[in-house]
Amino acid sequence: MRTEAERLLKLYSETPGASGNEELVRKVFCQELNGHAFSADRTGCVLAARDGDPKDGPRVMLTAHMDEVGFMVQNITKTGFIEIVPLGGWWPHVVLAQGVIVMASSGRAIPGCVAS
């Protein structure tokens, strides 16, 4: 049986959110905050708060960013290979043979694998 933390980690890490396209991650995150106080600003930042008693311990702030390593399709070859360019920083040596999800402009998720 999975813990709530494991469920959330799986949900967030499997939600597509390449740099500049974090809308789906933001939507999933806000859905999970249902019932808790939160707000979102025009830049896409989500702020959430949970009331507590100061006598219970120190205040804690958690911060994270929603985007992940991503690529943009530059070209599709005649043989069907997709040529990509990175969005943000990445390490080329860890990408080979990794599974990817190609998000079509229609919103369709297409599974793939990085080849050399």
Regions flagged by a language model, labelled:
Residues M1-S116:
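N-terminal hydrophobic/helix-forming segments and targeting peptides
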